[in-house]
Regions:
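Mid-chain, well-packed structural core segment of small domains
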Residues: 72-101
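Hot-dog-fold acyl-thioester-processing enzymes
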Residues: 1-78, 141-161
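Generic structural detector for well-ordered beta-strands
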Residues: 16-20, 86, 133-135
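HotDog/MaoC-like acyl-thioester-processing domains
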Residues: 2-11, 92-161
Length: 161
């Protein structure tokens, strides 16, 4: 992984990560943050809700945006400054989520970029939209991929049309 500096970033640059949502990943996040809402882990309870089955916590999907920023664009060394989010559809176990970040503004003098953020499910439906402000590293950061314990993400850093 190579973190880009403000001078390497351009309007329209895009990066994605793709992740399949599974019960183990949801359980790990629920345990890590203490979000024991039964909508995320209890099929009997979830059956009584409008969703009819467990759904992933919103922060799970939002975390994929963080992964795209921290590992792809601008990459290692970036500081995530702010994020606004809209959760549009539930994310269910088995869904494959594509988190995409697109540079929509570059403020070189302030070392800031504004990103459009979106997560899509395997049907191409938007499940999350938002906007983030990020401060790229002032120096290019090279961080070996081998330090990633469990690479759940598929790199699709090729340009998206």
């Amino acid at each position: 992984m190579i973190g880009k500096t403000i001078h390497e970033l351009r309007m329209g640059d895009v990066a994605e990560v793709i992740h399949q949502v599974d019960a183990e990943g949801v359980a790990e996040l629920v345990d890590a943050v203490g979000d024991y809402n039964p909508i995320h882990s209890d099929p009997d309870y979830a059956a009584s809700t409008p969703f009819k089955e467990p759904i992933a916590p919103g922060v799970f999907t939002a975390g994929l945006i963080s992964a795209a920023i921290g590992t792809r664009l601008p990459g290692p060394g970036a500081i995530y400054l702010s994020q606004n989010l809209k959760f549009l559809k539930p994310v269910k176990l088995g869904d494959t989520i594509t988190a995409r970040v697109t540079i929509v503004e570059v403020l070189r003098e302030r070392n800031r970029i504004r990103l459009e953020t979106v997560c899509l499910n395997q049907r191409g439906e938007e499940v999350l939209t938002g906007e983030a402000w990020v401060m790229p590293s002032r120096e290019s950061v090279v961080y070996p991929d081998r330090y990633i314990n469990k690479p759940p993400l598929i790199d699709t850093s090729a340009p998206v049309m």
